[in-house]
């Protein structure tokens, strides 16, 4: 099977750079599965898990809070607002963020506050979903 190069970067750091046999990303229109020689594409990504299968390694999970996905036949680049390796996600922190966001949604003072709270809630739920995926794999 062929491979392509993957770069996942956030404003803080490079999270992943290396070869992959396939990758699955949470694109705005739904999950996108990417194999070598994929048709070029540029799309936004939503909060969720990016799954990377590198040659001779177990599948790796990276949580992204949103950003952009660029696909070229031999390289995939994800520019994430925030990116965290799955193993580094903090469940207690994500649960607390979810609880805080739910309270903010209920107690909204303005439309802007409500939109921000909804975004925070969506991000916390996506983090918890990524943690659950890791647990199912036994990591």
From Swiss-Prot:
Family: Belongs to the ATPase epsilon chain family.
Major subcellular site: membrane
Lineage: Bacteria, Pseudomonadati, Pseudomonadota, Betaproteobacteria, Nitrosomonadales
Gene3D superfamilies for the chain: ATP synthase delta/epsilon subunit, C-terminal domain (1.20.5.440), F0F1 ATP synthase delta/epsilon subunit, N-terminal (2.60.15.10)
Function of the protein: Produces ATP from ADP in the presence of a proton gradient across the membrane.
Origin species: Nitrosospira multiformis (strain ATCC 25196 / NCIMB 11849 / C 71)
Cell location: Cell inner membrane
GO molecular function ontology, one term from the record: ATP binding
Keywords, sorted A to Z: ATP synthesis, Cell inner membrane, Cell membrane, CF(1), Hydrogen ion transport, Ion transport, Membrane, Transport
NCBIfam families given in the database record: ATP_synt_epsi, PRK00571.1-4
InterPro entries cross-referenced by the UniProt entry: ATP_F1_dsu/esu_C_sf, ATP_synth_F1_dsu/esu, ATP_synth_F1_dsu/esu_N, ATP_synth_F1_esu_C, ATPsynth_dsu/esu_N
Stored CDD domains: F1-ATPase_delta
Membrane-crossing segments per the record: none
The protein, known as: ATP synthase epsilon chain
Mode of membrane association: Peripheral membrane protein
One Pfam family, short name: ATP-synt_DE_N
């Amino acid at each position: 099977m062929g491979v392509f190069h993957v770069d996942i970067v956030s404003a803080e750091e490079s999270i992943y750079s290396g070869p992959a046999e396939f990758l699955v990303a949470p694109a705005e229109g739904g999950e996108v599965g990417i194999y070598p020689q994929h048709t070029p594409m540029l799309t936004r990504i939503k909060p969720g898990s990016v799954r990377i299968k590198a040659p001779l390694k177990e599948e790796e999970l990276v949580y992204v809070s949103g950003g952009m996905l660029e696909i070229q036949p031999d390289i995939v680049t994800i520019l994430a607002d925030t990116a965290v390796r799955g193993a580094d996600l903090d469940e207690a922190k994500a649960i607390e963020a979810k609880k805080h966001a739910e309270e903010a949604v209920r107690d909204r003072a303005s439309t802007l506050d409500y939109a921000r709270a909804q975004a925070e809630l969506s991000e916390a739920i996506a983090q918890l979903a990524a943690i659950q995926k890791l647990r199912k794999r036994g990591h």
